[in-house]
């Protein structure tokens, strides 16, 4: 029977309670992580296994050529990992101006010249080396099995796959890898990715070295050269992920932690710092005043982020200056409760997407995200090993007169990144690992869901399920069709220019949440998984 895969009725999800939990946007990935825990592995082992599986089961969102970030609570402290890769050695402004013209504002959105060094696999290895209990090769076994035997394509993945196909079918390796019948798979159709199984085996056997100096690196260099690119095995061999200290912002008695720039996580911190100057709880949770204040705070945050955030060594201001309480209080004063505004960047200088999370009964928690950037990334797939390559290079600027000169492309430099894991603590102790994927929706989702939990005491699943808005540019925002009509009317009356979106799968991100209930070995955790994706939280 051919079923109709449109869903006219609202579905309710409830939180999951368990002592060991994996929450992801695909059930097979969550189950792979749980298998690692049942074998004696910890939360980090589970996250790596889930991350590997999801490169196979959600190829629109990530692949073996992705970037990644993580925040880990190791039982004593938080540790951050930046596994985003840099530009190839040949990527100068002149390189792009000669190939694409001096008036091109960015490197290409698709194709081989949008590919920076992929960092996700190196991130898996770094996490395994520092925290893992199981052999690295064991963690990739579920992904290898799925790549070889195949899986049935779920609803949301299929929608995104089909939507991306017209733009990408002509990119090198794309049709061969992702259009086996000359089209995107249908919902419930079996898809195999046997070349990626070969790549996964090589990565497992070499503990990642095949991709960073071995047979896969050589294949990527040959493929890149054949299609006019410049990434080399030497670029790949030079790469190492970076351990970083998360940056933080206090809010309502808790502390939110994000990975520091070159990522946009600081936007969520800025917005919360601005909102701390308002009594949100005095306004209705879904009312126009609360939503208006959140939208305006997010606009102010993005104004500064798009102006200043880049590779840290090239930034004109520091994260500390951008988060200075006095500066954020001054930005809060710009908000007019009765009028939407288009804000410009301030001057903070003074004297001075997939997401998954796992937690285990021994207290280890990990907030992890990896992404190809736009759907299927560059669209380019190295065919021998099934390496689907990201397009993070498009995040650079090639415009000498652009808004953010600190983000100009340069050899060995990392571009502005959108993917951000988050972690919440209270008095130095872990409370919640969470994230909301979806380009610039990520910090907006971090802020909106956290406000619902901390200001309005909504549980993580309710906060996750609630209608969202998404700021775009200027006065324009997208709002989910489920938002209260009175609130929508009230926002319009204040000058917000709104597009009502019926298809929530495309525009509003998707989150996964694990909230620590007490002693992990006794009370355990509460988990939530976003209904806007195919995923689930699983545990025991």
Stretches with model-predicted labels:
Residues 412-414, 446, 455-506:
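Extended C-terminal subregions enriched in glycine
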């Amino acid at each position: 029977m051919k079923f109709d895969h449109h869903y006219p009725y609202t579905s309710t999800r409830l939180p999951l309670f368990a002592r060991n939990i994996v929450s992801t946007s695909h059930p097979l990935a969550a189950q792979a992580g749980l298998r690692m825990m049942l074998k004696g592995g910890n939360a980090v082992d589970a996250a790596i296994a889930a991350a590997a599986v999801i490169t196979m089961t959600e190829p629109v969102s990530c692949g073996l050529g992705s970037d990644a970030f993580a925040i880990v609570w190791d039982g004593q402290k938080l540790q951050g990992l930046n596994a985003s890769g840099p530009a190839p050695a040949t990527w100068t402004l002149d390189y792009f101006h000669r190939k694409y013209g001096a008036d091109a504002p960015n490197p290409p959105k698709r194709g081989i010249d949008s590919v920076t060094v992929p960092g996700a696999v190196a991130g898996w290895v770094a996490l395994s080396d520092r925290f893992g209990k199981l052999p690295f090769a064991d963690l990739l076994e579920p992904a290898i099995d799925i790549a070889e035997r195949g899986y049935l394509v779920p609803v949301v993945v299929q929608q995104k796959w089909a939507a991306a196909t017209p733009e990408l079918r002509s990119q090198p390796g794309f049709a061969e890898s992702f259009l086996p019948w000359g089209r995107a798979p249908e919902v419930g159709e079996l898809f195999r990715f046997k070349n990626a199984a070969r790549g996964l085996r090589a990565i497992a056997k070499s503990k990642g070295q095949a991709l960073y100096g071995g047979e896969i690196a050589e294949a990527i260099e040959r493929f890149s050269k054949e299609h006019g690119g410049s990434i080399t095995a030497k670029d790949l061999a030079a790469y190492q992920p970076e351990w970083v200290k998360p940056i933080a912002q206090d809010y309502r008695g808790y502390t939110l932690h994000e990975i520091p720039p070159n990522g946009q996580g600081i936007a969520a911190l800025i917005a919360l710092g601005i909102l701390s100057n308002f009594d949100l709880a005095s306004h209705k949770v879904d009312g126009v005043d609360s939503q208006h204040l959140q939208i305006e705070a997010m606009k102010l945050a993005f104004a500064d982020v798009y102006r200043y955030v880049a590779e840290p060594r090239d930034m004109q201001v520091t994260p500390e200056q951008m988060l200075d309480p006095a500066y954020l209080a001054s930005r809060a004063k710009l908000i007019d409760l009765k009028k939407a505004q288009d804000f410009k960047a301030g001057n903070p200088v003074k004297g001075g997407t997939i997401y998954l999370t796992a937690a285990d009964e021994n207290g280890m928690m990990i907030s992890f995200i990896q992404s190809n950037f736009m759907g299927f990334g560059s669209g380019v797939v190295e065919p021998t090993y099934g390496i689907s390559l990201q397009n993070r290079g498009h995040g650079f600027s090639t415009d000498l007169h652009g808004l953010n000169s600190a983000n100009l492309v340069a050899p060995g430099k990392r571009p502005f990144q959108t993917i951000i894991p988050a972690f919440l603590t209270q008095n130095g102790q872990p409370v919640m690992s969470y994230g909301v994927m979806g380009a610039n929706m990520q910090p907006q989702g971090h802020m909106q869901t956290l406000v619902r939990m901390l200001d309005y005491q909504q549980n993580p699943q309710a906060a996750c399920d609630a209608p969202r808005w998404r700021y775009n540019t200027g006065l324009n925002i997208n709002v989910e069709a489920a938002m209260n009509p009175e609130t929508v009317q009230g926002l319009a009356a204040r000058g917000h220019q709104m597009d009502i979106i019926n298809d929530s799968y495309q525009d509003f991100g998707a989150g996964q949440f694990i909230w620590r209930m007490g002693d992990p070995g006794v009370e355990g955790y509460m988990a939530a998984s976003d209904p806007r994706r195919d995923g689930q939280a699983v545990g025991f």
